[in-house]
Amino acid sequence: MKSGFVSVVGRTNAGKSTMINSLLGENLCLVSHKENATRRKMNVVIMHKENQIVLVDTPGLHESNKSFNQLLIEAAKKSIDECDLILFVMSVFDKIDEYKKFLELKPKVEHLVVLNKVDLIEPEKLLAKLSEFNALEKVPNIIPYTSKNKFYKTKLLDEIIKYLPEHPYFFDPEYTTDKNTKDVIKELIIESIYQNLSDELPYCCEVLISKVIEKDNSLTIYADIVTDSENHKAMLIGRDANTIKRIGIVARKRISELFLLKTNLKLIVKVQKKWYDNENFLKKVGLKQ
């Protein structure tokens, strides 16, 4: 029996969360085409051949001078030092410089390079990409991957197990995440915000879950969407409340599908100026310890 923690790191939009969801077989981690959608570390529990893999989904590695983004970057870097193995995920279209930047972090544990989205590239171009890695002074263990083929899933999980220690399970095998119900619901609402709003507005929003009531095979959820200005509040609500309705419909569908319960979602938009610089608020929403 093996069990261990595996940090999943890489630049923003490398496909980390999509990869984790495909390995798990559920859409648990927040997925968006926008950068820095993942804000919080999430442990995802995967059972494979009587072994337990705890994948740690982290914020994307990127360069930024903004204090809030620095907070996300530090969370990702910290996870690198608190695991048994690192999966460095990069798109097959990324330059090898992305991997070199990762090496500059001087990881203390072994790592695998997961070359993601290989289904989108021609075979000869994939070979050319692999040859770039072979030219490095120390050639890493590279695992090609696509979420659209189960063969790649099994191959990656088999490879991960080789690096994990003999250890009892850290979590009940029935668990899929260590997050509580409120945390999972929060992520699904944030995902809907990213899907339904454009430009910079999603980055100005955070979600607080006030109450979750489970009764008679249904969920009733009271949640606040917190933004930083009255102007952004108006945009979130939209004309005739169409935008907030759309956010609610998408989030409610995802929550209902995940928990297999009829869901009633009540959203209220509130303003808290510069919430991203408020230490107490960041602790309250789980972005800072």
Question: What are these regions, as identified by a protein language model?
Answer:
Residues 181-289:
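P-loop NTP-binding site
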Residues 24, 28, 43, 47, ...:
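Signal for well-folded cores of large energy- and translation-related assemblies
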Residues 109-110, 119-183:
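Canonical P-loop GTPase G-domain recognition
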Residues 1-80, 224-227:
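Conserved G1/Walker A P-loop phosphate-binding module
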Residues 9, 19, 42, 57, ...:
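Residue-level signature of catalytic and energy-coupling elements of molecular machines
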Residues 45-52, 71-142, 213-218:
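Conserved C-terminal guanine-recognition region of P-loop GTPase G domains, centered on the G4
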Residues 38, 62-63, 96, 121-122, ...:
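Catalytic P-loop NTPase motifs of RecA-like helicase/translocase cores
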Residues 15, 152, 243:
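Conserved glycine(s) of the Walker
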